């Protein structure tokens, strides 16, 4: 059975990863000519929008063969606004290639990606690209990597005539030079190796290469390659490195079925394509696959497999490989197929922190816009959106302005809907202060429904989200009614007392009664929001604001300015640390206050400063800070208005 490696290529914008992908395919023989980003004819940027803009938006999957190893490769977006695409890709990888431009060096996005790969222990090769460009400096970038990312890096090549088209490379192991980087890193990682070296036993090249391969596959060290993908320099060395320094995927077809959905697309005929990375077992055409959290199974109608630059139809896929499955209409990105295991990584890099209103310029197309967003959200679950029940405005959560531009172009190109955005705001949340309880009895007071519901609300731990518990047995309240209550609780929690989503909350169903001839799930669905909001009102809520974890690096002469800015933005941070000729400051900062700070730093440090942020979570805002939001549904706290709306809807 052929060995398989599933790898991803990640990088900051314009580091050249799509060009690297094209050259890997070309030098491995998978394609006959190299596509170019500027000509819009690359293999992986298949969306028309990607070709027009020259950037990767959706992760693409393609394969090639090298040294009798099948390599499935995912080319991911580089812009931070498409971090959700990168996030999903990482769940499927055996290894990652992190591309850094030899001209621009380490960027904020580079640090975010590397820290995530390190945290998830994904074996990583670093490739320093664009060494043919004027201004490129490999030695400087390598020292930046050691200083700012990891000292467990090993340079495997020497490069000459950098910054010109005459640039060329020599493998260190093709010369008589014993690599000091390798000796130092291996001495740190391998006690037996260190003892022999101190004892005067000089390691040979074969031993060093064997040890480097072992520890790279564990994710303990990072091989560094270099080149210029635009002219094909360094690509064959990188191909060898993929097979030498990444672990092979498990091919245990006899184990229990285990896989993860990492991507969803639709064909021109609107047929759903489910991309699956299989970690164990096998899937064949006509197999029935259990849908997570649902009591249904769906039949696999067709399977496509990646094969040497193309896609071929197959009867089955086996452990270690990537397959494209047809017929699984209910599966979503992130769903586990079969059983979960420790290889299915729990990834959370970022969450959208901005919310905006979106509408069709031709208002009559707003219903079509809602349908189009529904289809796009199927491919990107972090594209959360909702419609205001009162004025029918549509709200969408986003990472930033570039994603907003791309979403606008996609809606125009794919669905013929021109849109406009307004009222961009930061997403806050709220959480209960204390305990609150409420009960509404059927057909009493303001409850016209055949349903009795009692709820208790209290704080949960930070980061727990919404925890729902039923203390009512299915014997006394049927499952269909209990499901309706839980669904209504989840839906109503999207807007609390301040209008923001209620989180870190424990909701307990304390009471539930029905009247056999008359009660329906709709009765419970309609009465629950009033009970929930009344209990929440008694508990009261506090505002939670989103925070970014940050690291700020600035020249020493900019320290006082940086500290003043951070204090003004309500950041909390540790004492500055001197690193060489720079100061490094780490801490937490409100998202609302730091949105434009990267541009400001670039200005006052003349491009020498670096501000790296990563979504941290939500924290209770200070008591004097308030940020209410207009309700987008009829407020169940105003029972008369809410009931009037519900009863009119029932009559209609």
Curated annotation (Swiss-Prot):
Keywords: Antibiotic resistance, GTP-binding, Nucleotide-binding, Protein biosynthesis. GO terms for molecular function: GTP binding; GTPase activity. PROSITE patterns: G_TR_1 (PS00301), G_TR_2 (PS51722). Pfam families: EFG_C, EFG_III, EFG_IV, GTP_EFTU. GTP binds at residues 11-18, 75-79, 129-132. Residues 2-252 form the tr-type G domain. NCBIfam families: small_GTP (TIGR00231), tet_protect (NF012153). The lineage of its organism: Bacteria, Bacillati, Bacillota, Clostridia, Eubacteriales. The gene is tetP. This is Tetracycline resistance protein TetP. InterPro entries: EFG_II, EFG_III/V, EFG_V-like, G_TR_CS, P-loop_NTPase, Ribosomal_Su5_D2-typ_SF, Ribsml_uS5_D2-typ_fold_subgr, Small_GTP-bd. GO terms for biological process: response to antibiotic; ribosome disassembly; translation. Belongs to the TRAFAC class translation factor GTPase superfamily. Classic translation factor GTPase family. TetM/TetO subfamily. Abolishes the inhibitory effect of tetracyclin on protein synthesis by a non-covalent modification of the ribosomes.
């Amino acid at each position: 059975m052929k060995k398989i490696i599933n790898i991803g290529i990640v990088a900051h914008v314009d580091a050249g990863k799509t060009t690297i992908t094209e050259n890997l395919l070309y030098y491995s023989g998978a394609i006959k000519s190299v596509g170019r980003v500027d000509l819009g004819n690359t293999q992986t940027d298949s969306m028309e929008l990607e070709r027009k803009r020259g950037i990767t938006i959706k992760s693409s999957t393609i394969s090639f063969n090298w040294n009798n190893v099948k390599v499935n490769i995912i080319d991911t977006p580089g812009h931070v606004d498409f971090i959700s695409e990168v996030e999903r890709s990482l769940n499927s990888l055996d290894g990652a290639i992190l591309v850094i431009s030899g001209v621009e060096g380490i960027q904020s996005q580079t640090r975010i990606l590397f820290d995530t790969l390190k945290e998830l222990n994904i074996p990583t090769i670093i490739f320093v690209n664009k060494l043919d460009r004027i201004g490129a400096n490999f030695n400087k970038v390598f020292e930046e990597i050691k200083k700012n990312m990891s000292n467990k890096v090993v340079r495997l090549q020497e490069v000459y005539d950098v910054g010109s088209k005459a640039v060329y490379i020599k493998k260190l192991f093709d010369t008589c030079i014993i690599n000091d980087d390798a000796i130092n890193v291996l001495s740190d990682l391998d006690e037996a190796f260190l003892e022999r070296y101190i004892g005067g036993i000089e390691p040979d090249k074969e031993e060093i290469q064997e040890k480097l391969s072992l520890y790279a596959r564990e994710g303990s060290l990072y091989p560094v390659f270099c080149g210029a993908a635009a002219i094909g320099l360094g690509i064959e060395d990188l191909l060898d490195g993929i097979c030498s320094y990444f672990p092979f995927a498990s091919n245990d077809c006899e184990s229990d079925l285990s896989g993860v959905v990492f991507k969803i697309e639709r064909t021109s005929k609107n047929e759903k394509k489910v991309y699956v990375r299989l970690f164990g077992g096998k899937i064949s055409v006509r197999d029935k696959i259990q849908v997570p959290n649902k009591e249904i199974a769906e039949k696999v109608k067709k399977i496509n497999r990646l094969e040497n630059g193309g896609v071929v139809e197959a009867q089955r896929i086996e452990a270690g490989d990537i397959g494209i499955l047809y017929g699984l209409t209910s599966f979503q990105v992130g769903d586990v197929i079969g059983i979960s295991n420790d290889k299915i990584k729990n990834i959370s890099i970022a969450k959208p922190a901005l919310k905006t209103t979106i509408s069709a310029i031709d208002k009559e197309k707003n219903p079509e816009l809602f349908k189009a967003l529904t289809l796009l959200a199927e491919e990107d679950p972090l594209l959360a959106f909702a419609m205001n029940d009162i004025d029918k405005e549509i709200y969408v959560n986003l990472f930033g302005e570039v994603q907003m531009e791309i979403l606008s172009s996609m809606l125009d190109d794919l669905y013929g809907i021109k849109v406009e955005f307004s009222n961009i705001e930061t997403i806050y949340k709220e959480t209960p202060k204390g305990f609150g309880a409420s009960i509404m009895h059927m057909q009493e007071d303001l409850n016209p429904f055949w349903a009795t519901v009692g709820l208790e609300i209290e704080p949960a731990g930070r980061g727990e989200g919404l925890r729902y518990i039923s203390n009512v047995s299915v014997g006394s309240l049927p499952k269909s009614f209990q499901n309706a209550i839980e669904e209504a609780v989840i839906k109503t929690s999207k807007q609390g007392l301040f209008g923001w989503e209620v989180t870190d909350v424990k909701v307990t169903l304390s009471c539930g009664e029905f009247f056999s001839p008359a009660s329906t799930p709709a009765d419970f669905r309609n009465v629950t929001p009033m009970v929930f909001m009344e209990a929440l009102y008694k508990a009261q809520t506090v505002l939670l604001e989103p925070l970014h974890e940050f690291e700020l690096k600035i020249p020493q002469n900019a320290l006082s300015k940086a500290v003043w800015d951070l204090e003004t933005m309500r950041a909390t941070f540790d004492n500055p640390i001197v690193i060489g000729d720079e100061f490094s400051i780490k801490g937490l900062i409100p998202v609302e206050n730091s949105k434009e700070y990267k541009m400001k730093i670039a200005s006052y440090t003349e491009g020498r400063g670096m501000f790296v942020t990563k979504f941290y979570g939500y924290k209770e805002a200070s008591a004097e800070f308030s940020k209410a939001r207009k309700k987008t549904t009829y407020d169940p706290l105003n029972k008369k208005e809410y009931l009037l709306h519900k009863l009119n809807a029932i009559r209609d």
